[in-house]
Amino acid sequence: MEIFNTVASLKNFVAHARAEGKTIGLVPTMGALHRGHISLIHRAVAECDICVASVFVNPTQFNDKRDLECYPRTPEADAAVLAEAACHAVFMPSVEEVYPEPDTRVFDLGSVAEVMEGKHRPGHFNGVAQVVSKLFMMVEPDKAYFGEKDFQQIAVIRSMVNLLGLPVTIVACPIIREEDGLALSSRNVRLGTEERAIAPSIARILGQSRTLRPAHTPEAVTRWVTESLNALPHLQVEYFEIVDGNSLQKIDNWQDTDHAVGCITVYCGEVRLIDNIKYED
């Protein structure tokens, strides 16, 4: 596996692969890699001739400076994990390499970027669009792979791709979970013992909420999920919304969409965890 720290060296690698007619899959990450990330690598390796991963903690998508400072960074371990997963190349740049000067671009990402995470983390998705668009321009991938745990992020990136007219297919990959149901996240390492023990309740309550659908409105299910989680120690729901899986707009009735998704953010202690559940039949 090749490791690149500069844009020039990465582009040179990509150009050689393109000249040989090879297809390229990109897996953008912020490092602290886990089995969820590796599932994306395996998918890219299976579907493309060349798999390129990026490991970069992007400062422009953090609206909380402390969250940025606390984000786990394990570059040596990440490189070893990627090599073992048969990734062909990894891009591990400095902030200065990605942003030689401030990125002042503001993207019109539409309503999918204004709700939920967009409402609670102002500027977050614009920062995501900044870094992902840069990576797409550097690598020019045929496909890019993202995990469905970040359900809204996938919708936002698809919006950005349409806005910029980029020739890349966005591949959404299933959430990978621990045996107890907790969605894998780089932030999970920050959970204390008691917090880690209670965190799987998020997925459990979401799963139970599916059984309420036949006899209850989306609003009633939303209220039940929120109250059930808030009643547990260490957990505080920031938001839970049941939305149309394409527009991400809240639904009032199940009949409003055939692709209902419940998106949730919960503070477990001081750690912000996200998850979602599909209410499709």
Swiss-Prot record:
Compartments it resides in: Cytoplasm
Enzyme Commission number(s): 6.3.2.1
Single Gene Ontology BP annotation: pantothenate biosynthetic process
GO cellular component, one term: cytosol
List of residues binding beta-alanine: 61
Main subcellular location: cytoplasm
InterPro entries: Pantoate_ligase (IPR003721), Pantoate_ligase_C (IPR042176), Rossmann-like_a/b/a_fold (IPR014729)
Keyword Cytoplasm: yes
Enzyme class: ligase
Amino-acid positions noted as binding ATP in the UniProt annotation, renumbered to this chain: 30-37, 147-150, 176, 184-187
Catalytic activity field: (R)-pantoate + beta-alanine + ATP = (R)-pantothenate + AMP + diphosphate + H(+)
Pfam family name, one: Pantoate_ligase
Subunit structure: Homodimer.
Family indicated by similarity: Belongs to the pantothenate synthetase family.
Additional record remark: The reaction proceeds by a bi uni uni bi ping pong mechanism.
Function: Catalyzes the condensation of pantoate with beta-alanine in an ATP-dependent reaction via a pantoyl-adenylate intermediate.
HAMAP family named among the record's database cross-references: PanC
The protein's name: Pantothenate synthetase
Classification of source organism: Bacteria, Pseudomonadati, Bacteroidota, Bacteroidia, Bacteroidales
